[in-house]
C-alpha cells in the first residue's frame, strides 16, 4: 500500500490534478474548468484519471485543493470526499504557508499567487519575481525575507485575442503562436504579432519597473515564468531565466506538508 497525495489546482480555464508519491510528482492531468458539472461528474473524472494511471483510490491518503473559482467550492471538495472518502485541505488565507503575506488585505490575494510564492521560496533563491502567464497575467514579488508584497495583474493573452475578435466587425479569431516577423503581411499575422510581441513587451516592462522600484538588478532576483503561455512568451523575455510549469502543483505539496500535523 502506498501513501499518495492528490493535489488539485482549480483555475479559470483548466483544472490540474497531480499525484505525488513521496516528493515525486508521478502523474498530472489537465481538464477543462466547467462550472456546470456536478460533484458526481467530477468524482467520475477523478476515478477515470486514477484508474488510467493505475493508482488505487485506497492509496490516496491526503488531498489538497487550491482554487480561484469560488463557484467550484464546494463542488470539487465534495467530489473528493465522495469518491476517496477523505476531507481535502483547502488553501485559504488562514492556512500555514511559511511566508508573510504583506498584501493590504491578505484575503484578497488569489490563492494561486500565494501557492506559487510558497513554491518559489522553497525551490529557488529569493528575492523572486513570478510571472504567471495564464487566463490573466500576474506578477508577484517576494523579498529575501519571504515576504509576499503583491505585484500586478494584466489581462491574459487569450482574453485579449478574444476581445479583438468579439469587439470588432472584421478581425478574425486567431491561433496564439509565435509569428515569423513583427511586420505581419496578413490580418492574422498582424494580429499574432500585436498580441504575442505586445505581451512580451508588457511582461518585460513590468518586470523592469519592479526591479527599478526595488532597486535590484536582474542578476539579484530570480525571475520565473509559469502558466499555459509561458513557453511561448518567456523564451523571448530579456529577464525571465526559469520556466517552471509545475510550480503550483509543487506549492500545493509544500503547503500540505506544512499543515500535515495541524
UniProtKB/Swiss-Prot annotation:
Substrate binds at residues 103, 110-113, 187. It is found in: Cytoplasm. The active site is at residue 112. CDD domains: ASKHA_NBD_PanK-III. Keywords: ATP-binding, Coenzyme A biosynthesis, Cytoplasm, Kinase, Metal-binding, Nucleotide-binding, Potassium, Transferase. It is an enzyme of class 2 (transferase). Its main location: cytoplasm. InterPro entries: ATPase_NBD, Type_III_PanK. It holds the Pfam family Pan_kinase. GO terms for molecular function: ATP binding; metal ion binding; pantothenate kinase activity. It catalyses: (R)-pantothenate + ATP = (R)-4'-phosphopantothenate + ADP + H(+). Gene3D superfamilies: 3.30.420.40. Belongs to the type III pantothenate kinase family. This is Type III pantothenate kinase. It comes from Finegoldia magna (strain ATCC 29328 / DSM 20472 / WAL 2508) (Peptostreptococcus magnus). The lineage of its organism: Bacteria, Bacillati, Bacillota, Tissierellia, Tissierellales. The gene is coaX.
